[in-house]
Amino acid sequence: MRKGLIFDVDGVIIDVSHSYHYAIKNTAERFLRRDLDIELVREIKFKKGINNDYLATLEVIKTFGGSASLEEVIEIFNQEYEKLKEMERLILSRDFFKKLRDLKVPLGVLTGRPRQDLKDAFDRFELWEFFDVVVDDDTIEQPSLRKPNPYALNFCMERMNLDYAVYVGDSLADYQMVEGFKRQYTKRVDYIHFGDRVLPPSVKVVRSEEELFQALKEALQNQEEV
């Protein structure tokens, strides 16, 4: 059995609480012409399980009685994010990924980040060397099949030639993608939830790099016993 580990980026590898989250807030404020509480913005994104931040911004605007087109939101959002991206920090260290590489299993990324944003971040934090396969929001041509569609997870596993994977995510959308995958595909996938901004039911939750490393080791070892 070929086993591997697949990671979300935002909220798992990289802290985007001062970049993407504020880009949503600032963009919505420009359309609504009013100030918004950042925690209310986060609540809308996470509790509604919205993976795409452009769509999360539209939902915030709609929630507060405004309107905008997706094209307008994308243009303003990208301007706001460009001003904030240097605020990002690593959550999982390079040493963490070096330790994972010592486990001799392939590592992958499945993210909703646009390709250029991902490239900028991975260049900045020097992360490319750790991953065998990277699937970003531009990898899959048809938008409806991109993350969080379970097809995207299967696509990533196929590229990595895996029979079993652990997906590490931080959102309701991540959890729902894995649950959808289990209903549609025969390959085995386990989900580990990183952080506690939102807590899906009956899943393994870890809150630190150390806890995550141990949980990943245990998941891989458990497959050896199956």
Feature locations, PLM:
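Short, acidic loop-to-helix structural element flanking the phosphoryl-transfer center
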Residues: 6, 82-109, 113-119, 150
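Short, hydrophobic alpha-helical segments
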Residues: 160-164, 216-224
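N-terminal helical cap/lid subdomain that shapes the substrate entry/recognition surface
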Residues: 3-9, 13-96
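Structural recognition of alpha->loop->beta junctions
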Residues: 127-139, 198-218
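Substrate-recognition "cap/lid" segment bordering the active-site pocket of phosphatases
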Residues: 108, 114-166, 172-183
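Short beta->alpha linker loops
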Residues: 19, 95, 113-114, 148, ...
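Core-facing hydrophobic residues within beta-strands of well-ordered domains
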Residues: 2, 131, 188-189
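Acidic, Mg2+-coordinating phosphoryl-transfer loop and its flanking beta/alpha structural elements
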Residues: 167-207
